Amino acid sequence: MSLVYMNIMTAFAVSLTGLLMYRSHLMSSLLCLEGMMLSLFVMATLMILNSHFTLASMMPIILLVFAACEAALGLSLLVMVSNTYGTDYVQNLNLLQC
């Protein structure tokens, strides 16, 4: 396994560890999710380029579209929670349930 793949897997693992450790603030959770999606995008792109599998060349673009939608929803939720409660704690999301 090449050094590039190891670095990308390490970036994914660090983002996952950050997501599991720093769960108190919504902004840090969203940043860790974006790091995970970015490393998945780069890994998928490299694998498709190395295997010369042209039929799956749209898969990284679709992944990037879903990452953008996730970021937009996450930021809108962050703005709503911070305007309502004044903080961005994840524990405030439990108060949104009916």
UniProtKB/Swiss-Prot annotation:
UniProt enzyme class: translocase
InterPro entries assigned: NADH_UbQ_OxRdtase_chain4L/K, NUOK/Mnh_C1-like
Catalysed reactions, semicolon-separated: a ubiquinone + NADH + 5 H(+)(in) = a ubiquinol + NAD(+) + 4 H(+)(out)
Main subcellular location of this protein, as a coarse class: mitochondrion
Transmembrane region(s): 1-21, 29-49, 61-81
UniProt keyword 4Fe-4S present: no
Pfam families hit by this protein: Oxidored_q2
E.C. no: 7.1.1.2
Designated name of the protein: NADH-ubiquinone oxidoreductase chain 4L
Organism listed in the record: Pantholops hodgsonii (Chiru)
